[in-house]
Each structure stands twice: as structure tokens, then as C-alpha cells.
Amino acid sequence: TGIVSLQGDSPALSGNWRLSAPALQPLLTQIDVPAQFEKPLGFQGQASWQAGYINISNGLLSYGPTDVTGDLLIDVAGSTLEFDLQSTTPDLTDYAPQNDIIAPAFSIPIDFRSSGQITEERWSVATFQLESTQASVSGSGELELDGDEFIDSHITSDIRIANLTAFSEIFDLSFPDQDLQIIVDMDSRGGALVVEQFDLRSGDSDLSATGQANNPSAPQIVLNVDSDRLDLSPWFALLETAEQSASDSEGAEPDAESAPDRLIPDYPLTHRLLNTFQADTTVSIRELRGLPRPLLNVLTRIDVGKEGIRVTSARAENQRGGVAQLTGTLIPDAEGIPELS
């Protein structure tokens, strides 16, 4: 039941609707829907629509075995997204390719809940929860995106993954055989967004960070990173598979248009991105493993921003008492070509 308005150049719908489709493909005629995603689709609930505006109340969207319930408001003209949604998926294997060997990590239920509001000036998430047998993610907060001060921003997050190898076959990457835990707590204070806690634990490695960011429109970031022991060796296989995947999708060489805009041709760190922020980072690591020989008491200070990359100081010791120190810069010249010194 509902009302259909055809007045003027902006048709509109409103009412209590019950819609169903036995498959997606007839609805998406411009693309080929993979067989594993060809599932019945249904919706029921209070909804209104007109060009650039959708408002759903107490809606229920069913897509195969997945149910999504809640409220959703999309206002393109007002650049606003409001949502209060809950989703359940009994088993992810329902969305795996039928002819492939199903990764054990797929055979899990997923519960998801999120509510908040997103505008051009602010991201606000009151609730974010994702639960499965392999991982749990929770968080909330507000982040200001405009203005010259952080007045009312705060972010908390807790991410726990039992074993990263569960995601290797899902993403076709070689994740290390170890757990991962990340805890984040940030709050605005004196016009700055202060990193009060950032703790990362994975396997035998630990990493903590504190610092602050000023000016939401053009962030100026100061970050202090500290670690008792950081072992890079479990992550090399992941980096290799990620680089191979990127190479396969983009080609062996950067294209002619994107390469000149990059500070380092093989990495997507563009001059445009560097002009949007300034970061001063100090890193202290008591023991760094994963290189040909372990390094001790690593201390570096690196500035990154519109001028490029500047290594103000870098110092490390080896197990025999040797000490190495260096400084350097990677800065674009007047024509935008990076110069290493």
C-alpha cells in the first residue's frame, strides 16, 4: 500500500511496501551477477522515495539467508546519511563460489549492528559491532571533518582476531599465523584530537602510539610510536602477495599519467595527498627483527608532508655494539621530480 506521485519532474513514492524478486539478475541488466550472488531478494517496511532522497523505517531486507533490519535515511541534497541497522548471516559459505574449495574461514555466522549519522562536516557512529567466531570489532565516536579545531571528536575501537590465517583464503593473501588485537582511544582536547591510547599486539610483537592531530581541514599530526619488540618476518609473505595482487590488477609498471604525480613511482603516495597533511613521527623500537640481523634501540624521526619526506634523524645498534646513524630527504624539485639527498 502507498502513494505514487507523478506531479512535475520529480516522481515520488511513499507508503508501506512489500516487494520481492526471485533473483538479482533481472534487476541488474547492465552487469552479470555471479552465480553465488544470484539469490532471492525481498523487502518490507515503511519507505518513501524521490530523486536524491530515500527514507526507510522499520525495514526488513532479505537477501538469500541474510536479513538486514532497521532504519535508513539518504539525503543527497543535504549530504546526509543516517542509519540504524542490524544484520545477521548464518553462514558465509552461502556466498562462496560453488565450484571452488570452500575455505573453512567462510563457514561462520556473522552478526552486525551499526547506527549513526554521516555528513560533510562530521562522521558520527553511536554503535558499531561485528561479531563472528573468528573476529570481533566494536567501536563508536565522532570525527569532525571541517573547521580549524577538533572541538567534539572522540573515537574508541576494539578489534580482536583469533588467528589472521582465517582470512588468507578469503582475501587470497598470505596472512601470518598469529592473533591480532588493536585498541584505540582518541578524544578532543584544547582544539586537538589526542591519541590517548593506540595499542597493537600480534604474535610476539607490540606497538603503542600516542600523539595528536590539529586542524581538521588540513591535519597537522604529531605521533610518537613505541615498541619493545617488533618482528617483521611474519608479514613479509603478506606484503609479497599484496604487491603481486596490485601488480596483476594495475600492470607491471605505473601508467604514464599516475607515475609523475607520485613521490616514489612504485608506491601510490601522490603529491596531492602529501599536500593535505603534515605528519611528524618519532619511532622508538628496543628490538627490531625480520631483517638479516636484529637491530637494537632503533630511534627515528620522520617528517612527511607537502615538502616530501624528511628523515631528521635515524639511529640503530646491532648486537655487537655497532651504531649506525643517517639523515636524508626525498623532496620534489621545482618541476615536481623527487630528489634524494
Show the residue positions of the predicted features:
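Membrane-proximal interfacial segments on either side of biological membranes
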Residues: 1-57, 62-194, 205-314, 322-341
